[in-house]
């Protein structure tokens, strides 16, 4: 079911800077107050740690009463098969945060609008985290899930 919410062009521009040019560490998106467009709400500085992203999400979701989307550049360390030592890689993940105590209408609007954002930005192939509480964004568990679901 499509919601009719459009993706603002600033979302694509910000995502290109994150994904292709690595100028940001994360982008937090929200549906605007008129429920007509998905817009960029916050952009993280280039080398901002994952913990900063989580702290910003906590501030923006008003004690778990609001939903958000995010694209986050996550750094992971891997042991490559047949190689000595480890390698550090960056992977962009997509986060859909919809807490259980957000109003039902907001949760439904975010759920029905996510497809438009993913299609507009080309996010379909990204690893996705669906979070309903802040603990779902724990850095260690997100990285562990990312590594177990990706072929690197």
From Swiss-Prot:
GO terms for molecular function: actin filament binding. Residues 4-147 form the ADF-H domain. GO terms for biological process: actin filament depolymerization; actin filament fragmentation; actin filament severing; embryo development ending in birth or egg hatching; locomotion; positive regulation of actin filament polymerization; skeletal muscle thin filament assembly. The keyword Cell membrane does not apply. Pfam families: Cofilin_ADF (PF00241). It comes from the Eukaryota. InterPro entries: ADF-H, ADF-H/Gelsolin-like_dom_sf, ADF/Cofilin. Keywords: Actin-binding. One of its GO terms (cellular component) is striated muscle thin filament. Disulfide bonds: none annotated. SMART domains: ADF (SM00102). PANTHER family: COFILIN-RELATED (PTHR11913). Belongs to the actin-binding proteins ADF family. Depolymerizes growing actin filaments in muscle cells; required for the assembly of actin filaments into the functional contractile myofilament lattice of muscle. This is Actin-depolymerizing factor 2, isoform c.
